[in-house]
Regions:
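Accessory terminal helices/loops
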Residues: 111-113, 196-201, 209-262
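Hydrophobic/aromatic beta-strand patches that form the interior of the parallel beta-sheet core
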Residues: 14, 61-63, 80-82, 130, ...
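A generic, well-ordered mixed alpha/beta core segment in the N-terminal half of proteins
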Residues: 65-110
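Active-site metal-binding motif and surrounding structural segment of the metallo-beta-lactamase
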Residues: 35, 45-83, 197-200
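Short acidic-hydrophobic surface loop/beta-edge motif
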Residues: 7-9, 30, 134-139, 204
Length: 262
Protein backbone atom coordinates (compact mmCIF):
# COMPACT_ATOMS: atom_id res chain seq x y z
CA UNK A 1 0.00 0.00 0.00
CA UNK A 2 1.19 3.50 -0.83
CA UNK A 3 -0.94 5.66 1.44
CA UNK A 4 -1.49 3.42 4.47
CA UNK A 5 0.46 0.99 6.60
CA UNK A 6 -1.78 -1.97 7.33
CA UNK A 7 -1.45 -3.54 10.79
CA UNK A 8 -3.50 -6.50 11.97
CA UNK A 9 -4.93 -5.78 15.42
CA UNK A 10 -7.06 -8.92 15.86
CA UNK A 11 -8.39 -11.83 13.82
CA UNK A 12 -10.21 -10.20 10.93
CA UNK A 13 -9.42 -6.63 11.99
CA UNK A 14 -6.80 -4.19 10.78
CA UNK A 15 -5.66 -0.65 11.46
CA UNK A 16 -4.81 1.37 8.36
CA UNK A 17 -2.27 3.88 9.61
CA UNK A 18 -1.93 6.99 7.44
CA UNK A 19 1.42 7.01 5.66
CA UNK A 20 1.26 9.81 3.09
CA UNK A 21 0.07 13.37 2.61
CA UNK A 22 -2.93 11.97 0.74
CA UNK A 23 -4.03 9.95 3.77
CA UNK A 24 -3.56 12.03 6.88
CA UNK A 25 -6.13 10.25 9.06
CA UNK A 26 -6.12 6.62 10.15
CA UNK A 27 -8.81 4.13 9.16
CA UNK A 28 -9.89 0.66 10.21
CA UNK A 29 -11.16 -2.50 8.55
CA UNK A 30 -13.23 -5.26 10.10
CA UNK A 31 -14.19 -8.57 8.50
CA UNK A 32 -17.81 -9.22 9.40
CA UNK A 33 -17.83 -12.64 7.78
CA UNK A 34 -17.54 -12.37 4.02
CA UNK A 35 -18.09 -8.63 3.91
CA UNK A 36 -16.00 -5.73 5.14
CA UNK A 37 -16.68 -2.70 7.31
CA UNK A 38 -14.43 0.33 6.77
CA UNK A 39 -14.11 2.80 9.63
CA UNK A 40 -13.34 6.26 8.20
CA UNK A 41 -12.27 6.93 4.62
CA UNK A 42 -9.39 9.43 4.77
CA UNK A 43 -9.48 12.73 2.89
CA UNK A 44 -8.74 11.82 -0.73
CA UNK A 45 -10.34 9.36 -3.13
CA UNK A 46 -6.92 8.11 -4.23
CA UNK A 47 -6.11 6.98 -0.69
CA UNK A 48 -9.61 5.64 -0.05
CA UNK A 49 -9.33 3.38 -3.10
CA UNK A 50 -6.62 1.44 -1.32
CA UNK A 51 -9.10 0.69 1.46
CA UNK A 52 -11.89 -0.16 -0.96
CA UNK A 53 -9.62 -2.61 -2.76
CA UNK A 54 -9.04 -4.76 0.31
CA UNK A 55 -12.31 -6.64 0.10
CA UNK A 56 -16.03 -6.42 -0.64
CA UNK A 57 -17.02 -3.43 1.48
CA UNK A 58 -20.61 -3.57 2.73
CA UNK A 59 -20.50 -0.88 5.41
CA UNK A 60 -18.61 2.38 5.87
CA UNK A 61 -18.59 4.36 9.10
CA UNK A 62 -17.88 8.09 9.36
CA UNK A 63 -16.72 8.72 12.93
CA UNK A 64 -17.12 12.51 12.75
CA UNK A 65 -17.38 15.26 10.17
CA UNK A 66 -13.77 16.32 9.67
CA UNK A 67 -12.68 15.97 6.07
CA UNK A 68 -9.58 13.90 6.78
CA UNK A 69 -11.94 11.11 7.85
CA UNK A 70 -14.82 11.38 5.35
CA UNK A 71 -13.82 12.89 2.01
CA UNK A 72 -12.91 9.48 0.62
CA UNK A 73 -16.55 8.37 0.88
CA UNK A 74 -17.25 8.63 -2.83
CA UNK A 75 -15.18 5.58 -3.85
CA UNK A 76 -17.26 3.10 -1.85
CA UNK A 77 -19.89 2.41 -4.47
CA UNK A 78 -22.39 -0.19 -3.34
CA UNK A 79 -21.58 0.27 0.34
CA UNK A 80 -23.88 1.86 2.90
CA UNK A 81 -22.31 4.76 4.80
CA UNK A 82 -23.39 5.26 8.41
CA UNK A 83 -22.85 8.16 10.82
CA UNK A 84 -24.62 9.93 13.64
CA UNK A 85 -27.43 12.25 12.64
CA UNK A 86 -25.43 15.32 13.66
CA UNK A 87 -22.33 14.19 11.77
CA UNK A 88 -24.33 13.83 8.57
CA UNK A 89 -25.60 17.38 8.92
CA UNK A 90 -22.09 18.70 9.60
CA UNK A 91 -20.62 16.91 6.59
CA UNK A 92 -23.30 18.55 4.45
CA UNK A 93 -22.53 22.03 5.75
CA UNK A 94 -19.10 22.42 7.35
CA UNK A 95 -17.20 20.07 5.05
CA UNK A 96 -18.71 21.72 2.00
CA UNK A 97 -17.55 25.11 3.29
CA UNK A 98 -14.03 23.91 4.08
CA UNK A 99 -13.64 22.14 0.75
CA UNK A 100 -14.70 25.27 -1.12
CA UNK A 101 -12.18 27.29 0.88
CA UNK A 102 -9.41 24.79 0.19
CA UNK A 103 -10.07 24.86 -3.54
CA UNK A 104 -10.04 28.65 -3.55
CA UNK A 105 -6.75 28.63 -1.65
CA UNK A 106 -5.17 26.20 -4.11
CA UNK A 107 -6.07 28.52 -7.00
CA UNK A 108 -3.87 31.25 -5.51
CA UNK A 109 -0.98 29.08 -4.29
CA UNK A 110 1.89 27.93 -6.48
CA UNK A 111 3.90 25.67 -4.18
CA UNK A 112 1.38 22.88 -3.58
CA UNK A 113 2.47 19.45 -4.88
CA UNK A 114 0.55 18.53 -8.05
CA UNK A 115 -0.71 15.27 -6.53
CA UNK A 116 -2.49 17.31 -3.85
CA UNK A 117 -4.07 19.60 -6.44
CA UNK A 118 -5.23 16.60 -8.47
CA UNK A 119 -6.60 14.83 -5.41
CA UNK A 120 -8.62 17.85 -4.28
CA UNK A 121 -10.02 18.36 -7.78
CA UNK A 122 -11.36 14.80 -7.73
CA UNK A 123 -13.25 15.06 -4.44
CA UNK A 124 -17.03 14.79 -4.70
CA UNK A 125 -18.43 14.80 -1.16
CA UNK A 126 -20.84 11.96 -0.41
CA UNK A 127 -23.16 12.07 2.56
CA UNK A 128 -23.88 9.11 4.82
CA UNK A 129 -26.84 6.99 3.72
CA UNK A 130 -28.05 6.01 7.18
CA UNK A 131 -27.86 7.63 10.61
CA UNK A 132 -27.99 6.38 14.19
CA UNK A 133 -28.51 8.14 17.50
CA UNK A 134 -26.69 6.19 20.22
CA UNK A 135 -25.66 2.68 19.19
CA UNK A 136 -25.65 0.45 16.12
CA UNK A 137 -24.58 -3.19 16.06
CA UNK A 138 -22.68 -4.82 13.21
CA UNK A 139 -22.33 -8.26 14.73
CA UNK A 140 -18.93 -8.32 16.41
CA UNK A 141 -18.58 -4.54 16.03
CA UNK A 142 -20.51 -2.04 18.14
CA UNK A 143 -20.76 1.50 16.78
CA UNK A 144 -21.38 3.91 19.65
CA UNK A 145 -21.57 7.63 20.32
CA UNK A 146 -21.35 9.30 23.72
CA UNK A 147 -22.10 12.69 22.18
CA UNK A 148 -19.57 15.34 21.26
CA UNK A 149 -16.05 15.95 22.53
CA UNK A 150 -13.58 16.36 19.69
CA UNK A 151 -16.46 17.70 17.58
CA UNK A 152 -20.17 18.15 18.24
CA UNK A 153 -20.70 14.45 17.53
CA UNK A 154 -18.11 11.66 17.69
CA UNK A 155 -18.52 7.92 17.22
CA UNK A 156 -16.21 5.01 17.93
CA UNK A 157 -16.17 1.31 17.03
CA UNK A 158 -15.65 -1.36 19.68
CA UNK A 159 -14.82 -4.95 18.77
CA UNK A 160 -16.22 -6.62 21.84
CA UNK A 161 -14.90 -10.08 20.91
CA UNK A 162 -11.33 -8.90 20.42
CA UNK A 163 -10.77 -6.02 22.83
CA UNK A 164 -10.09 -3.49 20.08
CA UNK A 165 -11.23 0.14 20.17
CA UNK A 166 -11.25 2.23 17.00
CA UNK A 167 -11.38 5.63 18.70
CA UNK A 168 -10.97 8.01 15.74
CA UNK A 169 -10.01 11.50 16.94
CA UNK A 170 -11.41 11.04 20.41
CA UNK A 171 -7.96 9.63 21.21
CA UNK A 172 -4.65 10.35 19.47
CA UNK A 173 -1.36 8.59 20.15
CA UNK A 174 1.60 10.88 20.79
CA UNK A 175 -0.04 13.58 18.69
CA UNK A 176 -1.38 17.03 19.55
CA UNK A 177 -5.14 17.22 19.20
CA UNK A 178 -7.20 19.58 17.08
CA UNK A 179 -9.42 21.19 19.71
CA UNK A 180 -10.87 24.00 17.61
CA UNK A 181 -14.24 22.32 17.03
CA UNK A 182 -14.34 20.63 20.40
CA UNK A 183 -15.93 20.70 23.82
CA UNK A 184 -13.05 19.98 26.22
CA UNK A 185 -14.93 19.14 29.40
CA UNK A 186 -17.34 16.85 27.58
CA UNK A 187 -14.33 15.29 25.83
CA UNK A 188 -12.76 14.43 29.17
CA UNK A 189 -16.02 12.83 30.26
CA UNK A 190 -16.10 10.71 27.12
CA UNK A 191 -12.52 9.57 27.73
CA UNK A 192 -13.51 8.47 31.22
CA UNK A 193 -16.31 6.37 29.74
CA UNK A 194 -13.99 4.88 27.12
CA UNK A 195 -11.61 3.88 29.89
CA UNK A 196 -14.40 1.74 31.32
CA UNK A 197 -14.68 -0.36 28.15
CA UNK A 198 -13.03 -3.75 27.70
CA UNK A 199 -10.14 -3.21 25.29
CA UNK A 200 -6.40 -3.75 25.09
CA UNK A 201 -5.72 -2.39 21.60
CA UNK A 202 -6.40 1.24 20.70
CA UNK A 203 -6.52 2.44 17.10
CA UNK A 204 -6.35 6.26 17.20
CA UNK A 205 -7.44 8.77 14.60
CA UNK A 206 -3.81 9.87 14.25
CA UNK A 207 -0.64 8.17 15.41
CA UNK A 208 0.40 4.55 15.80
CA UNK A 209 -1.64 1.71 17.24
CA UNK A 210 -1.53 1.87 21.03
CA UNK A 211 -3.17 0.59 24.18
CA UNK A 212 -4.86 1.66 27.38
CA UNK A 213 -1.87 3.69 28.56
CA UNK A 214 -2.17 5.87 25.46
CA UNK A 215 -5.72 6.79 26.41
CA UNK A 216 -4.39 7.80 29.83
CA UNK A 217 -1.62 9.86 28.21
CA UNK A 218 -4.05 11.64 25.93
CA UNK A 219 -6.42 12.41 28.78
CA UNK A 220 -3.45 13.87 30.66
CA UNK A 221 -2.66 16.02 27.62
CA UNK A 222 -6.15 17.53 27.59
CA UNK A 223 -6.04 18.09 31.35
CA UNK A 224 -2.59 19.69 31.17
CA UNK A 225 -3.41 22.06 28.34
CA UNK A 226 -6.63 23.18 30.02
CA UNK A 227 -4.67 23.94 33.19
CA UNK A 228 -1.92 25.70 31.22
CA UNK A 229 -4.43 27.91 29.43
CA UNK A 230 -6.08 28.81 32.71
CA UNK A 231 -2.82 29.59 34.51
CA UNK A 232 -0.59 31.05 31.81
CA UNK A 233 -2.87 31.99 28.92
CA UNK A 234 -2.10 31.72 25.23
CA UNK A 235 1.69 31.73 25.71
CA UNK A 236 1.95 28.86 28.18
CA UNK A 237 5.15 26.88 27.53
CA UNK A 238 4.79 23.38 26.19
CA UNK A 239 5.72 20.71 28.75
CA UNK A 240 8.74 18.59 27.93
CA UNK A 241 6.67 15.40 27.67
CA UNK A 242 4.73 16.76 24.67
CA UNK A 243 7.57 18.37 22.71
CA UNK A 244 8.19 15.36 20.48
CA UNK A 245 4.52 14.68 19.74
CA UNK A 246 3.27 14.95 16.15
CA UNK A 247 1.55 18.13 14.90
CA UNK A 248 3.93 20.21 17.01
CA UNK A 249 2.11 23.47 16.28
CA UNK A 250 -0.97 22.04 17.96
CA UNK A 251 -0.05 23.20 21.47
CA UNK A 252 -0.01 26.89 20.53
CA UNK A 253 -3.04 26.53 18.29
CA UNK A 254 -5.05 24.84 21.03
CA UNK A 255 -4.03 27.45 23.60
CA UNK A 256 -5.28 30.16 21.26
CA UNK A 257 -8.61 28.36 20.95
CA UNK A 258 -8.97 27.79 24.69
CA UNK A 259 -8.07 31.34 25.69
CA UNK A 260 -10.20 32.83 22.93
CA UNK A 261 -13.32 31.12 24.31
CA UNK A 262 -13.26 33.14 27.52
Amino acid sequence: MTHFRLEQVADGAWAAIAASDLATGNAGLVDLGGEMLVFDTSWTPVAARELAGLGPVRWVVNSHWHGDHVLGNQVFEGATIVSTRATRELIATRDAERLAGLRQELETTDDVPPEIVEAVAEIEPRLPDEVFDERRSFGRAELVTYGGGHTSSDAFLHLTDAGVLFAADLVLVRSHAWMGDGHPQAWLGILDRLAGLDFDVLVPGHGDVGGRSDLDDFRAYLTDILAAAEEHGAHAPIPERYRDWAFEDGWARNLAFLTGRR
